[in-house]
């Protein structure tokens, strides 16, 4: 691929251009083929650019918008009043072929609703799913979905999530990703009817390497490459994990910060631990993809800092280069055809 363009909702998140503009410049330095379109308040964006001594401005376009979808806006209201907002304009750029992907740290519900409205779902996809990588004990990562796009699902939808997650994992990890269903136990008799029905469907699909159920305490064990659940369970699991990780990291920092000698000894004695703690930092995995659409949309944490938002841009670049929507569409067509026979 000779070049690609990512549209950024520059006004989304807790910090807006203060974080997103430096993150855009950081991404441009990392990806020479990348161009950025910034949608938002022109004066606020240029003010941030003026603070940065970089030479990549020729690859940045600013499209002015003084309208922002507030965090408290309901998705239904956002659909009716989205014209001219920074989020809608960034999504329209993807829909109109002016950009290859969109990244936003704005209102999650509004982003999902507007993404479905502007980009539409791929054939064979009932509902898009939010997916993100999570760390494991090993060198690889695990993809967890759904993370909140659908608080309730049927078995067919969970099956589609498994297919989409497998395609994404194949492009990053292995040619035959291990797929598991998140459940309250590993035994076949455990779980509700929804999970059992999906397990049966996955077991009968030759295109999916289904390994069975996995419990919550094994999320980070590296036993599966893709873990599937509904959005309610996935969101609670992820937020709980992030809270525990932050508690551990902050407690450790607080302990060693009280004494200079402790800090010195910690850096010397616990170098490997510092590497492990960095791996647990949720910012390293910022950027949840909305899979199942005809275009690429990545959701960043609203509280993301510059490095974290740059990671979200990197995820968008990764998916564009690997043509994830096209590969998901092709795989779903194959799987659905086999199920009909």
UniProtKB/Swiss-Prot annotation:
Catalyzes the reversible formation of acyl-phosphate (acyl-PO(4)) from acyl-[acyl-carrier-protein] (acyl-ACP). This enzyme utilizes acyl-ACP as fatty acyl donor, but not acyl-CoA. Keywords: Cytoplasm, Lipid biosynthesis, Lipid metabolism, Phospholipid biosynthesis, Phospholipid metabolism, Transferase. This is Phosphate acyltransferase. Gene3D superfamilies: Isopropylmalate Dehydrogenase. One of its GO terms (molecular function) is phosphate:acyl-[acyl carrier protein] acyltransferase activity. GO terms for cellular component: cytoplasm. It catalyses: a fatty acyl-[ACP] + phosphate = an acyl phosphate + holo-[ACP]. InterPro entries: FA_synthesis, Phospholipid_synth_PlsX-like. The keyword Flavoprotein does not apply. The keyword Glycosyltransferase does not apply. GO terms for biological process: fatty acid biosynthetic process; phospholipid biosynthetic process. It is found in: Cytoplasm.
């Amino acid at each position: 691929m000779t070049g690609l363009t990512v549209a950024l909702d520059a006004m989304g998140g807790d910090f807006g251009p203060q974080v997103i503009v430096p993150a855009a410049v950081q991404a441009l330095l990392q990806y020479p083929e990348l161009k950025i379109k910034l949608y938002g308040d022109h004066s606020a964006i240029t003010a941030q650019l003026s603070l940065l001594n970089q030479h990549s401005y020729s690859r940045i376009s600013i499209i002015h918008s003084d309208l922002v979808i507030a965090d408290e806006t309901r998705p239904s209201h956002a659909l009716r009043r989205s014209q001219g907002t920074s989020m809608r304009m960034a999504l329209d750029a993807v829909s109109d072929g002016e950009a290859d992907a969109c990244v936003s740290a704005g209102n999650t519900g509004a982003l999902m609703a507007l993404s479905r409205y502007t980009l539409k779902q791929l054939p064979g996809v009932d509902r898009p799913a939010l997916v993100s990588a999570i760390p494991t004990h090993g060198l690889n990562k695990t993809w967890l979905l759904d993370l909140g796009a659908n608080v309730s699902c049927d078995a067919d939808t969970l099956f589609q999530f498994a297919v989409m997650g497998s395609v994404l994992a194949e492009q990053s990890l292995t040619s035959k990703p291990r797929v598991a269903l998140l459940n309250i136990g590993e035994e076949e008799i455990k779980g509700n009817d929804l999970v059992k029905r999906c397990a049966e469907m996955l077991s009968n699909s030759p295109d999916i390497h289904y390994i069975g159920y996995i419990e919550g305490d094994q999320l980070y064990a590296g036993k599966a490459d893709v873990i599937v659940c509904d959005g309610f369970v996935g969101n609670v699991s992820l937020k709980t994990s992030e809270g525990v990780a932050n508690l551990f990291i902050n407690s450790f920092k607080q302990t060693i910060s009280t004494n200079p000698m402790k800090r010195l000894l910690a850096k010397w004695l616990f170098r490997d631990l510092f590497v492990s703690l960095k791996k647990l930092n949720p910012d390293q995995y910022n950027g949840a993809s909305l899979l199942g659409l005809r275009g690429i949309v990545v959701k960043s944490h609203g509280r993301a800092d510059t490095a974290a938002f740059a990671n979200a841009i990197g995820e968008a670049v990764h998916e564009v280069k690997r043509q994830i929507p096209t590969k998901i569409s092709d795989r779903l067509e194959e799987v659905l055809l086999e199920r009909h026979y």
